[in-house]
């Protein structure tokens, strides 16, 4: 649809509404679909959006309903190879005029059966053009036979006299004619006063010879042309005898070269239609009144798609053109001139006749009760046929080419349909100027939706509707770094040294790291506690982990900030805690003395933070702690580690190192409160637990160490354990 809409953006100074769009090009025809809905169009029973099969030639569109819409206009343009400048300068030759009038004529054989076979147009040939022989047989008629007759009650001599006067006017001005594709038609373009009531008098109209229907039973095609007239027996015999004589001369003289093909019939006429179709049905179902004028025609043959035509439903859209051809400010209320009950309505270009209301005969531009037309009345005032309905008798001056069209279209909407479409409706009362267009009815402070620049045509996209079901979004994994800060009391006794240093020993400040039971971990307590509603963010206050030393009861606190967790740093710090720079002797102490000094994992369990109190005395890790006194002269000391077993084998010592690291990591992990979906915080639901790459916590609580880069295999981890066990192995050997 965007591609089709872009075809209508003809020039830089074109003002087009996006609802008007090219629909299709078929049989050398360009079909325009224009939104043109009256305020009472929903009562006509428009079906939902159906396939546009009637445009393709299958004639499935209910044209009767479309033609009941008084704004629907069917326009047929002659495709003769005449120059437009010739027609505007009144210097057109007779041959092109003969073919022009010949398109509107036919033999009386067709007109005799024009009121029969109304249901015989289902063969899909309505889209086709007139047959070539129809145009050829009427090309050889005399000038008295090349005119249009509108008086059915006059005699044949009166018809010939009237036809002579009209033929002289036809040589001065070339005009395009309407051609309807159904029995019921709407408006004439050149003869704006000849409008027949198409609402209730259909059976009466079908019986008259003034009907503009012509059917062709010979070719099994229904030919709907502008007019059908009575012909004399002389004209019938003359047209039949000269059919084959002038066939090749007239049929190929004025046809464009690009349209020459074997199928002469379908390439004879180019049709331009402005119809109400798909967009009309969409707008009608939502009670949106979109009112659009039919096409006006300039003297030179250019098309002016003008301002909305005042219709019988008392439309408030009755603006008029400025002399420059742009919109001019109009009143919000309809004037008395455009009232549906007033007879002045028929002074406009394409009036909509009331049911039985006919104007007085003193108006030269009014519709006569006998549908008689005086051609000299319109041709003496050629300007009025384009502009008399708009209230201004000046022809727009900006129409210089077919690409330069002033096309203001208004959508006057109800209050409930402003957000239903991608094309928001505009209100006519908010159009004091083209550059200050409003978005919605009644709002004057809304910025203009259309660009007021002449170099572009932009339409703002309306906000997309909110999704009812949110799609899952893949979030990038971000590694959380744990930065552990050691207090000053801790840093006094911890010295970081390299692995394998000859002077490495045990730090006097650390002999035991208290870890709670894994069976009843803090993480499970968080999951099971239903009373703990308030989440603890990652930027929670710092926690203190109190650990006791083996020599003194002075607690050593480690202050941790969980803003930036970094598990490789934890591994480095734990390793540095297990190693010491200065060799110091560690005295053996009994398990009973250690039990009195057994450490507790302290947490600031205040009611404000809703942190669960954790005051678990450790199971007697100190009973299993292995402390060895060694000689200070030994170059390679033995490292004492926290273990959970009583075994003193070197392999068990390596397992103790790994277990102590895993338990310490579990402690940190269990202290972290993950945000839930119920959090009011903006960071809730960001799945912070998925960003941990250091420790994987399966459901069976079997902790598996995994590095962030996942390159650290268990073989590398075993190599690290062997490096840590080398001092112990050397001591055992010695």
Curated annotation (Swiss-Prot):
Residues 130-141, 620-631 have a biased composition (Polar residues). A lipid is attached at residue 707 (GPI-anchor amidated serine). Disulfide bonds: none annotated. This is Predicted GPI-anchored protein 49. Residues 1-16 form the signal peptide. Residues 228-259, 464-479 have a biased composition (Basic residues). GO terms for cellular component: plasma membrane; side of membrane. Residues 110-129 have a biased composition (Acidic residues). The gene is PGA49. It comes from Candida albicans (strain SC5314 / ATCC MYA-2876). The keyword Nucleotide-binding does not apply. Residues 78-145, 216-262, 331-360, 447-479, 582-653 are annotated as: Disordered. Glycans are attached at residues 27, 56, 68, 71, 105, 118, 136, 180, 388, 427, 517, 622, 631, 711. Transmembrane segments: none annotated. It is a lipid-anchor; GPI-anchor. Residues 708-734 form a propeptide. Keywords: Cell membrane, Glycoprotein, GPI-anchor, Lipoprotein, Membrane, Signal. Induction: Up-regulated upon milbemycins A3 oxim derivative (A3Ox) treatment. The keyword Glycoprotein applies. It is found in: Cell membrane. Residues 453-463 have a biased composition (Basic and acidic residues). Residues 87-98, 592-611, 632-650 have a biased composition (Low complexity).
């Amino acid at each position: 649809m965007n591609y089709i809409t872009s075809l209508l953006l003809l020039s830089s100074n074109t003002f087009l509404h996006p609802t008007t769009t090219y629909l299709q090009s078929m049989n050398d025809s360009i079909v325009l679909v224009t939104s043109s809905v009256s305020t009472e169009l929903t009562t006509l029973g428009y079906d939902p959006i159906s396939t546009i099969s009637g445009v393709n030639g299958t004639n499935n569109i209910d044209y009767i309903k479309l033609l009941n819409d008084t704004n629907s206009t069917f326009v047929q343009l002659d495709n003769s190879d005449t120059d437009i400048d010739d027609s505007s300068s009144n210097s057109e030759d007779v041959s092109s005029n003969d073919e022009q009038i010949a398109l509107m004529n036919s033999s009386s054989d067709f007109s005799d059966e024009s009121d029969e076979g109304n249901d015989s147009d289902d063969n899909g040939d309505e889209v086709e053009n007139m047959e070539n022989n129809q145009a050829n047989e009427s090309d050889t008629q005399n000038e008295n036979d090349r005119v249009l007759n509108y008086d059915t009650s006059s005699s044949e001599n009166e018809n010939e006299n009237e036809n002579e006067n009209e033929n002289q006017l036809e040589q001065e001005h070339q005009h395009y004619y309407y051609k309807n594709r159904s029995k019921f038609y709407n408006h004439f373009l050149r003869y704006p006063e000849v409008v027949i009531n198409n609402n209730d008098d259909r059976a009466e109209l079908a019986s008259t010879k003034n009907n503009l229907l012509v059917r062709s039973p010979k070719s099994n095609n229904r030919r709907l042309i502008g007019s059908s007239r009575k012909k004399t027996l002389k004209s019938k015999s003359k047209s039949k005898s000269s059919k084959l004589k002038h066939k090749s001369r007239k049929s190929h003289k004025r046809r464009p070269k690009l349209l020459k093909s074997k199928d002469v019939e379908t390439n004879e006429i180019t049709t331009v239609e402005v119809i109400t179709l798909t967009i009309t049905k969409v707008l009608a179902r939502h009670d949106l009144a979109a009112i659009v004028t039919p096409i006006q025609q300039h003297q030179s043959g250019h098309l002016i798609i003008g301002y909305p035509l005042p219709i019988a439903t008392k439309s408030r859209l009755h603006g008029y053109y400025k002399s420059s051809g742009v919109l001019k400010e109009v009143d919000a209320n309809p004037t008395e001139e455009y009232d549906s009950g007033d007879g002045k309505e028929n002074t406009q270009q394409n009036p909509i006749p009331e049911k039985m209301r006919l104007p007085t005969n003193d108006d030269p531009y009014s519709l006569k009760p006998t549908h008689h037309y005086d051609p000299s009345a319109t041709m003496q005032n050629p300007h009025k046929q384009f502009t008399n309905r708009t209230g201004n008798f000046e022809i727009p001056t900006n129409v210089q080419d077919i690409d330069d069209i002033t096309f203001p279209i208004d959508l006057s909407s109800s209050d409930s349909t402003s957000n239903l479409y991608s094309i928001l409706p505009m209100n006519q009362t908010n159009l004091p100027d083209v550059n200050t267009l409003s978005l919605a009815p009644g709002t004057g402070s809304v910025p203009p939706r259309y660009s007021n620049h002449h170099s572009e045509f932009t339409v703002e996209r309306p906000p997309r509707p909110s999704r009812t079901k949110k799609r899952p979004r893949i979030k990038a994994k971000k590694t959380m770094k744990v930065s552990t800060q050691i207090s000053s009391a801790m840093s006094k006794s911890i010295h970081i040294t390299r692995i394998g240093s000859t002077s490495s020993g045990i730090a006097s400040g650390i002999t035991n790291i208290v870890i709670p039971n894994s069976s009843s971990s803090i993480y499970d307590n968080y999951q099971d506690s239903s009373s703990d509603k308030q989440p603890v963010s990652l930027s929670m206050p710092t926690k203190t982990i109190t650990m006791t030393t083996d020599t003194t009861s002075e607690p050593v606190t480690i202050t941790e900030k969980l803003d930036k967790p970094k598990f490789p740093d934890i591994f480095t710090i734990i390793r540095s805690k297990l190693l010491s720079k200065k060799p110091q002797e560690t005295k053996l102490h009994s398990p009973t003395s250690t039990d009195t000094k057994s450490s507790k994992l302290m947490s600031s369990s205040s009611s404000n933070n809703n942190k669960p109190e954790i005051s678990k005395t450790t199971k007697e890790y100190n009973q299993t702690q292995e402390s060895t006194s060694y000689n200070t002269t030994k170059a390679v000391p033995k490292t004492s580690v926290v273990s959970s077993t009583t075994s003193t084998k070197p392999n068990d010592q390596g397992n103790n190192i790994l277990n102590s690291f895993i338990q310490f990591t579990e402690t940190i992990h269990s202290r972290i409160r993950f945000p839930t979906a119920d959090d009011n915080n903006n960071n809730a639901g960001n799945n912070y637990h998925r960003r941990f790459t250091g420790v994987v916590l399966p459901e069976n609580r079997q902790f598996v160490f995994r590095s962030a880069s996942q390159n650290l295999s268990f073989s590398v981890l075993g190599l690290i354990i062997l490096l840590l066990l080398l001092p112990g192995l050397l001591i055992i050997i010695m």
